[in-house]
């Protein structure tokens, strides 16, 4: 049970931790560790998580997707709201839009 464990998070140097877009990645890594199930290495994600589990939109989503593609990621989990106005024609990676944390976890862990 996660409530009975201590959680430590190691953030790589140079990463901005005051950016709410990191919320989805942090909670996904904690769940991955608790379940002892790895997140596929080609998956990237960005999203702010609200108190009720909704995935809120983040700024600069096109820039984030572009950088993820340059780094070799194949799948990107993002807030569904960020799909509005997104030029998907130039994006080669698979985009997985989600509204709730549960949807993101299904995309990650089946």
Residue ranges with predicted function:
Residues 1-110:
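Peripheral, non-AAA+ core regions of ATP-driven protein-machinery
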């Amino acid at each position: 049970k996660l409530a009975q464990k201590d959680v430590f998070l190691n953030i790589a140097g140079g990463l901005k931790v005051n950016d709410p877009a990191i919320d989805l990645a942090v909670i996904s890594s904690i769940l991955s560790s608790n379940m002892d199930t790895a997140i596929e290495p080609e998956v990237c994600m960005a999203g702010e998580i609200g108190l009720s589990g909704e995935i809120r939109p983040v700024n600069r989503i096109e820039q984030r997707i572009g950088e993820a593609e340059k780094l070799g990621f194949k799948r990107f989990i993002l807030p569904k709201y960020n799909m509005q106005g997104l030029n998907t024609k130039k994006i080669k990676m698979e985009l997985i839009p989600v509204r709730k944390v549960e949807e993101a976890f299904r995309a990650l862990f089946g």
